[in-house]
Regions:
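Fe-S-dependent hydro-lyases/dehydratases of central metabolism
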Residues: 1-527
Length: 527
């Protein structure tokens, strides 16, 4: 339950006074008031399924809608209990039917305990085939956990989480993407696998992680939910939502050869509008020719890091790039893929909370200096050379196929010049999924990584959450990483700079933070 908006209630609580539930519901929407009065989401949903509660249906008249509003309109539960309404607008509140639900080992066990307690052990979940579980966050925890924390029992607790999720998945017949049988590592990070295998244009998908918007690159609405919503969604196959407003980010022009989607998002995060929190809880809709030119993998970097903006989700309207992804990487029939994206665009007169315009030609390779992803600045504007000890390329944000293309491009270029990873640097490259690892094998990248001196790691969240190789171990240790967050302590006690895969790899070779200079540009300068 959220804190009441009437802060005078805090004094009443301290005095031990009796407070009517209605006092906590003041200023809330109709559904939230009823959830509070019923004592929580589960008893409310139970009453809803028994036909004991009523709330006003969404009655918004047809209006020009954004792509996210169109998707919500198709999925909102209507007055008849079916799915779909004529239109929605920001502020409309109701329940949205969800297409896919996923959770990982941090959340599944608690949700499973709630489910078995309130619903019953062995009682089937609603539509188990659209629920996916993942063991990805803590796969490599034992490699970095200190002896002190082991003595506290943290490794044992992590193991208990693993087994609880495993047992619940088996009891329910739910697919669990877990650890590899023949070597250490996971099948894949939840977001990576959801993008590669499951998410489709036009869906509403929910997951137990803030970076669930990753799959918005596919042209779907995807957002993170907490344990209570996860558990309830297993019963109802819907979640409560207030339709958010949208911020449209238009990136025009042609980017430089050493600029990537990561540079775009770091530039966006550094803007006053974003840093001041004005984009909080909004849909971040990316558009413009520079976005259209990006692959689905690169678009996922933008949608993934809508979380760092504080957005509700991130989305790119699906186009031929998405169709090609579905055909080439999933083997889908082209006509079927084309049908999925039909009508999934924002209408010209759709209303936005705000529009941000960027010129790709003005953006150079970026870093976010230690402490916050919003501390963005151009690499060229760093006052002095910044020596590094660790370079890390991986995570959901930067462990995709195209990210591996970038690491391999820089390292292959270095090898041609007789260079490799600097002796003073450990460069870790971690795959986002087994599909990406297999891609690297086919492309011959593993040999490039090995020859260049990089340390290759099987899939898992790992260092990004301070739970795997690549974490810092000293406060004075400087790290450059392609991950999405560099908050203090996020990946160890060191000082972390965020950057693109190109910049991370180039810095690993140089031994200090530097831009990647493509070979053709160097040749042109030399000539």
């Amino acid at each position: 339950m959220r804190m009441p908006r009437n802060f005078s209630l805090i004094d009443c609580i301290r005095r031990g006074e009796e407070i009517p539930l209605s006092a906590f519901a003041q200023g809330e929407d109709e559904i939230t008031r009823q959830v509070i009065e019923y004592g929580g989401l589960f008893p409310f949903n139970l009453a809803r399924m028994q036909g004991k509660v009523f709330f006003s249906p969404i009655t918004t008249k047809p209006r020009p809608m954004t792509v996210s509003e169109k998707i919500f309109a198709r999925h909102m539960v209507n007055a008849d209990g079916g799915v779909g309404v004529e239109a929605v607008k920001p502020g409309d509140t109701g329940f949205t039917r969800v297409d896919l639900r996923f959770s990982h080992e941090y959340v599944t066990p608690m949700a499973a305990i709630f489910y078995e307690h309130f619903v019953g052990k062995g009682v089937p979940v609603n539509d188990r085939d659209t629920i996916k579980f993942f063991r990805d966050h803590l796969t490599f925890l034992d490699e970095v956990l200190s002896e002190e924390k082991r003595k506290m029992g943290l490794l044992d607790l992590a193991t208990q989480l693993k087994f609880k999720q495993q047992d619940f998945a088996k009891d329910q017949g739910i697919q669990l993407h877990c650890e590899l049988k023949d070597r250490k590592g996971s099948e894949g990070i939840c977001h990576s696998v959801m993008l590669e295998t499951y998410a489709l244009p036009g869906q509403v998908d929910v997951g137990s992680d803030s970076h669930t918007p990753h799959v918005g690159a596919m042209g779907c609405i995807a957002f993170g939910i907490g344990t209570t919503d996860v558990f309830n969604s297993w019963i109802t196959k819907d979640v409560r939502v207030k339709v958010p407003g949208s911020v449209r980010v238009v990136i025009r022009g042609k980017r430089k050869p050493n600029v990537t989607a990561k540079d775009f998002i770091l530039a966006l995060l550094a803007m006053d509008y974003v840093r001041s929190g004005k984009a909080l809880a909004k849909v971040i809709e990316y558009a413009g020719e520079a976005v259209e030119e990006l692959s689905v993998d690169e678009r996922a970097t933008l949608t993934n890091m809508a979380a760092e903006i504080g957005g509700f989700t991130g989305i790119v309207a699906p186009d031929e790039k998405v169709v090609a992804f579905l055909v080439e990487r999933r083997g889908m029939d082209r006509a079927q893929a084309q049908m999925l994206i039909e009508g999934l665009n924002s209408e010209p007169d759709a209303q936005y909370s705000h529009v941000i315009k960027l010129n790709a030609e003005d953006i150079a390779p970026m870093v976010a200096t230690p402490g916050d992803p919003g501390n963005g600045k151009f690499v060229r504007d760093l006052n002095t050379p910044v020596p590094i000890e660790i370079a890390y390329g991986g995570t959901c944000t930067a462990g995709k196929n195209e990210d591996m293309d970038m690491y391999a491009r820089v390292l292959a270029d270095a090898l041609k010049q007789g260079k490799r990873v600097a002796d003073s640097v450990k460069f870790y490259i971690q795959f986002g999924s087994q599909e990406t690892r297999d891609y690297c094998v086919r492309q011959g990248y593993l040999e490039v990584f090995k020859q260049a001196g990089a340390i290759v790691i099987e899939p898992g969240c790992g260092a990004c959450i301070n739970a795997g190789p690549g974490v810092s171990t000293r406060p004075d240790q400087i790290v450059i990483s392609a991950q999405n967050r560099n908050f203090p302590g996020r990946s160890g006690p060191g000082q972390m700079y965020l950057a693109s895969p190109l910049t991370v790899a180039a810095s690993a070779v140089a031994g200090y933070i530097t831009e990647y200079e493509p070979a053709q540009e160097r040749e042109a300068v030399t000539a």
